[in-house]
Amino acid sequence: MSTWANLGLQDSASPLMEQLIFFHDHALLILVMITVLVGYLMFMLFFNSYVNRFLLHGQLIEMIWTILPAIILLFIAMPSLRLLYLLDEINEPSITLKSIGHQWYWSYEYSDFNNIEFDSYMIPTNELSNDGFRLLDVDNRIVLPMNSQIRILVTAADVIHSWTVPALGVKVDGTPGRLNQTNFFINRPGLFYGQCSEICGANHSFMPIVIESVPVNYFIKWISNSVNS
């Protein structure tokens, strides 16, 4: 869930999200250092009355302010590229989940099992239980095993949607006629909430996503009950 006053990122539930948070903190530290340096130089220029009447050019300072930003950009670009490749890497999945975006709900199919598919609608506010979350709870949750490599295939039936779960560091566009995929690894049990992150019409904000992460033995029981029912 979001933190107080929407400050900061959600607690990570996957190794990829942990890496994203580390990169965010790394880049933010560099930006703070740049801001402090530029602010200090501006302050000194405003309150320094000394001038050099004979200064026509300064090759040394020009080299410094050309090379230094390039080095700083390298310190940002290298971790960013590393993380970009990590996010695109597809490992051998244990389970494949297919998600289809509609106006304005999600459909899910467990491709590795027969006849396990369902639609997931937002629960209206007047039907919520006392411990429910407004605009975030759904009637049918996605149930996935923790500590397993999961592949998700995302597409759409009408307009462009985007399947997004911040705690997992996952955001995949669902485009009609196209199949996009990514993978993630949930490292703890719990409920993880997401929403459609692409404007898709009047009820765009009413397309929540809820993942219930459970131990593998509970997931197997859930699959067995779903197949038998």
Curated annotation (Swiss-Prot):
Coiled coil: none annotated. It is found in: Mitochondrion inner membrane. Binds a dinuclear copper A center per subunit. GO terms for biological process: ATP synthesis coupled electron transport. Cu cation A2 binds at residues 196, 198, 200, 204. Residues 49-62 are mitochondrial matrix. PROSITE patterns: COX2, COX2_CUA, COX2_TM. Mg(2+) binds at residue 198. The keyword Metal-binding applies. It catalyses: 4 Fe(II)-[cytochrome c] + O2 + 8 H(+)(in) = 4 Fe(III)-[cytochrome c] + 2 H2O + 4 H(+)(out). Signal peptide: none annotated. GO terms for cellular component: mitochondrial inner membrane. Component of the cytochrome c oxidase, the last enzyme in the mitochondrial electron transport chain which drives oxidative phosphorylation. The respiratory chain contains 3 multisubunit complexes succinate dehydrogenase (complex II, CII), ubiquinol-cytochrome c oxidoreductase (cytochrome b-c1 complex, complex III, CIII) and cytochrome c oxidase (complex IV, CIV), that cooperate to transfer electrons derived from NADH and succinate to molecular oxygen, creating an electrochemical gradient over the inner membrane that drives transmembrane transport and the ATP synthase. Belongs to the cytochrome c oxidase subunit 2 family. This is Cytochrome c oxidase subunit 2. The gene is mt:CoII.
